[in-house]
C-alpha cells in the first residue's frame, strides 16, 4: 500500500467518513425538521469547522508521511492545505446567521424564515443540496464530513484521534463562552447564537468551496493564514506547537512527553522510509536499468559499425540514440 509509487499513475488513499452521534443514535451533524434540531445541527457543524480552522496544521501532520507527501497536491488527491467545503446552501445559512443582527429575520425562501429571538424555523438541509467537491480535503456531504487526505498505508486512528480531541476541546470552550453570557443575564438560546455568530466569523478563513488544486487557492490560503507548509519533517512540528500541547493537555488525550515521543517516531520513520526507497531506487538503477541500457547500447554500436560498411547508409539516428543512452547511464552512475 504505497500512496504514490510512480509518477503519472494515480495514488491511493482513504476517505474517513466522520460524524458525531448520541448514545440513542441521533446524528449531531444531521439537519433536522424542527428549530431545536437545526440549532443542534448548526452548533456542532460550526464547532467542527472551528476546530479544523484552529488545528488545520495539526490535522495535516496527522495524515502526512514520506509516501503520502507524494500524493497530496496531485491531481487525484486533496491539496496539502487543509480547508473545509460546505456546499452552497450550508454556506449561505452560516453567512446569513453571521450577518444577522438582533431579531432580524433571515429569509431563505417564501416559506422558511429563521428569527434570532424566536428560533422559529431553519430550512431543512437536504442531502442532495450539498455537492461533493473532490478537491476538498475536508468536505461536508449532508450529514457527515469526509476527511479525504489519509494515506493508504496509514492507520485511520491517528487522524481520528486528532479530530476528536480538537472537537472535544472546541465544544468545551464553546460551552464556557455560552455559560459566561448566560451568567451575564442573556437567555440561553440568545447566548448560543451570539457565540455561534462569533465563531462563524472567526473561522471563515477555513471555508473554501472552490478548486483546491489551483495556484490561486495556494496564494489565497497564505493570505488567510492557513498552514501551507509542504516539507513533511516541518509539518510534524505542529505536534509540538503550544496550541497543540494545550489542546491535548486540556482534553487529557496526550501529555507533552507522549507527543514528543510520537513526533520523534514520526521523524525516524520518515527518514527510514526515504532511505529505504533511495536504496531500492539505487539498486534498480545500478543492477537492472544500467546493465540493460549498456546491452542495448552495445547492440546499437554493432549496428552502426555494420552500417558503416555499406556505402550510402545513414546511421545518424542510431548514433544520437547511443549518445543519449551514454549520457543517462553516466548520470545514473555518478
PLM feature spans:
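Acidic, glycine-enriched catalytic cores built around paired aspartates
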Residues: 5-6, 10-12, 24-25, 40, ...
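Helix-rich catalytic cores of soluble enzyme domains
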Residues: 1-35, 41-47
